[in-house]
């Protein structure tokens, strides 16, 4: 079953039985959106906006109502540029997120994509706490054909990033992709660690383009938002990488993220292959689910 086919089937069933935009239709739509992981507030708000739109614009046909819903959901996701800004040399992208969400794998896939675009990419193994994290990243560096800077397990992450930035400047690298520890659930520790990395970037690459991407597992649904709020408060996020979207029917989490965090989804993981982390396109996403 393809990308969002389950969710598409649910919404298609709803619209295939459509006769008019009456109260029964709106109640069923709200329930469908909640089940799709938009969250209660987002689902209720979307349905209320659709009610108003149907009334004001006299929408009657199934397709007119469906397109009205698409427009509402699209508007929810207009929270920032979905493209990465990596124009300076080097640019730096920090990846954050808890263990098990596919952070290291996402870095490898993005590295491979940038390499195909002709960029010279370096990976920085600053997750020095998780056993074999650097080994895993090194495997991805080999697959993607990228350089990697790493140290011993338990090394200071800031020192690893410093070494990577020095090497990147010396070797004319375009983009540094930096893995970080996923175990820092304590907000104070997380803030201190990220602030330290940020200061090193400020000092070694002043004025460079910088991205801070939070990697989230889509299958965790609304629970993922709890993680995301903590990281948003501490990290100054520029975007989200949403993994394992192919493993869930609950694609509404994309809209919930945009609504609650005001941060765009920049990449969506739709499979295990090296090319299966795709730049996120909001229009294609909405048309895929509605």
Question: What is the predicted function of each stretch?
Answer:
Residues 1-4:
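Compositionally biased, charge-rich terminal segments
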Residues 101-108, 131-133, 223-225, 248-252:
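Short glycine/serine/threonine-rich phosphate/pyrophosphate-binding segments
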Residues 6-126, 133-178:
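Primarily NTPase-proximal linker/entry elements flanking Walker-type ATP/GTP-binding cores
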Residues 181-183:
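Short glycine-rich anion-binding loops that position phosphate/pyrophosphate groups of nucleotides
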Residues 96-97, 179, 215, 269:
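Short beta-strand segments
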């Amino acid at each position: 079953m393809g990308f969002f086919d389950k969710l598409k089937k649910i919404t298609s069933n709803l619209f295939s039985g459509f006769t008019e935009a009456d109260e029964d239709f709106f109640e069923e739509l709200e329930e469908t959106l909640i089940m799709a992981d938009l969250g209660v507030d987002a689902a209720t708000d979307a349905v209320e906006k659709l009610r108003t739109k149907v009334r004001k614009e006299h929408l009657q046909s199934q397709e007119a109502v469906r397109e009205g819903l698409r427009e509402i959901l699209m508007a929810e996701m207009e929270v920032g540029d979905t493209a990465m800004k990596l124009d300076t040399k080097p640019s730096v992208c920090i990846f954050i997120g808890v263990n098990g969400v596919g952070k290291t794998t996402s870095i490898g896939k993005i590295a491979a994509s940038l390499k195909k675009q002709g960029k010279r990419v370096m990976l920085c193994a600053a997750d020095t706490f998780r056993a074999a994290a650097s080994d895993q990243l090194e495997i991805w560096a080999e697959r993607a054909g990228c350089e990697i800077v790493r140290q011993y397990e338990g090394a200071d992450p800031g020192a690893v990033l410093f070494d990577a930035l020095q090497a990147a400047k010396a070797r004319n690298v375009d983009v540094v992709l930096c893995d970080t520890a996923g175990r820092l659930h304590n907000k104070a520790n997380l803030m201190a660690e990220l602030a330290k990395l940020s200061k090193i970037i400020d000092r070694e690459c002043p004025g460079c383009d910088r991205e801070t991407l939070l990697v989230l597992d889509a299958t965790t649904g609304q629970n993922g938002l709890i993680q995301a709020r903590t990281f948003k408060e501490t990290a100054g996020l520029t975007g989200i990488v949403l993994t394992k979207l192919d493993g869930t029917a609950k694609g509404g989490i994309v809209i919930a993220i945009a609504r609650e965090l005001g941060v765009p989804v920049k990449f969506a993981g739709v499979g295990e292959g090296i090319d299966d982390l795709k730049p996120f396109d909001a229009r294609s996403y909405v048309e895929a689910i509605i």
